Amino acid sequence: VHLLPSYDFGSVPERSEHQKTVDHAWLSSLPSNSPDQQAAVASIANDDAFNWGYDPVHYGVPEGSYATNPDGDARVLEFRTMVQGLAGLGLRTIVDVVYNHTLSAGPTDRNSVLDKVVPGYYHRRNFDGHYENSTCCNNTASENLMMERLIVDDLVHWAVSYKVDGFRFDLMGHLMLRTVVKARDAIKSLTVKRNGVDGSKIYLYGEGWDYAEVSGGRVGTNASQLNLGGTGIGSFNDRLREGVMGGSPFGDPRVQGVMTGLYFHPNNFMEQGGAEAQLKRVIEDSEKVIAAMAGNLREFEFTNKDGYPTPSRDACWVGSNVGYAAQPKETVNYVSAHDNETLFDGIMLRSAVDVPLDVRCRINRLAVATVAFSQGKHFSFTPFH
């Protein structure tokens, strides 16, 4: 079970009496195509109880709005009880950790913590002295020793005190590789006899995107996809997602891929090039899928479109390499996640108008099968409320 951020975040009022809600009876009375539902929800968005939680304030403390009482020790005891209960069902608990930024910074904001400890140290600044904001806001600087120490110590704290089974790093590529490797080593050193935890069973993975001020090693060697091979740390394999579905998270969601109709059943929603261009793309996308199902291993060889054996590392993908993993567990294969449309919604957006519903359902099953039958770690997005 992958939990969205569960540390103390600042975007939801912790006490239920301070949280605003919409009158659900009134909402249900509105026509299904009315704009009033979204307008009503948006009007209280800053004060309701819904937020993903990517707004860290205190890293080492469970979020109070999830507890029956945010004051006192209830949040600690209840989080531990939840993890224990999931373990009793045979389920492992992975927590989402967001060490790449903080909700606030500066000396005066009530949700600013690190800048009040040592002003200007824990956050990454540009040459003009302003905070880097490429993660969203207030990027942290794990290249600085004590920010790195905070991250490593906090991960060990969650492993030992709350018995979680794994960590999913948000925007892991904005952390230094050295930091994540130190965290791995610290966690792997935990033993049942000494710490009550078998650290060798704890899995680390994250978003290894390489962009903005950390791209290309400009700050230091970062924990991005191409740098993680051999570490045993996993990263999300967007090659599979984009090969199967088509497009990218930041492009037009109607761009097709291998399983959504590119070349074989193109939609007419947008210009995707002629048959020759689409055939070239569908072959390239197929190579991404082949490599991913073999664990995205950089040394895995397949026969390319020209009939020659090609190592996965030499197959090109948006100016980078398709294969980058040294071992299957360094690849987290997926075709949908919480950031974008659900898998079926993505298929509905991309499929040609004349594709019947039962075929769209078969496409959905086939897309899931590429994850289920691939080497590596399998990530399946099924939200629970």
What role is predicted for each listed range?
Residues 218, 336, 343-353, 378-385:
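Aromatic/acidic polysaccharide-binding cleft in carbohydrate-active enzymes
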